[in-house]
Amino acid sequence: MKLTADHESKAGAGMKLQMNAITFTADKAEKLKEVKPANPNGYYNYYEEQEGYTYFVVTGKAENEGSMALDTDNILVRGTRGNIEYKGKLLFSNTEESDLVNKMEKDAEQTFYFILLVKDGQEPPDTIEVFYNDDFRKSQKAEHYDYSIRWPVDSLDLE
């Protein structure tokens, strides 16, 4: 899918990504067959195993020092390696780290999960792209956003 943005930027190689007033600091990258919260309890959201695929997951801490919450349903995440695109999603842990949620409130610090689906045998993405709009509002045009950030993640150690 051809995506466009009015303003494009590239995060520096390394562990941090800045998106509006939210700072993402990566701790690790890993390949997983399923993605669960750190302390699952009762009913919880998770990504179950998909035959023929592995999840490439970048996790760490996100800190929202802004005045707006982020609903990840309003942004688009994908991974890339050369001409290959990987479908992606951004989720957060709730405060108890017992569930995966799609919202980060203002003045919050939460664990984040950039989750990208990779075919078995395929190299994982070396870049994560995030497309979003002012105030994190929903895009009016399916393939156009106000901002895009390219975040090189190939320097993260794959566990």
Give a label for each model feature.
Residues M1-V57, K61-E159:
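Conserved functional micro-motifs across diverse proteins
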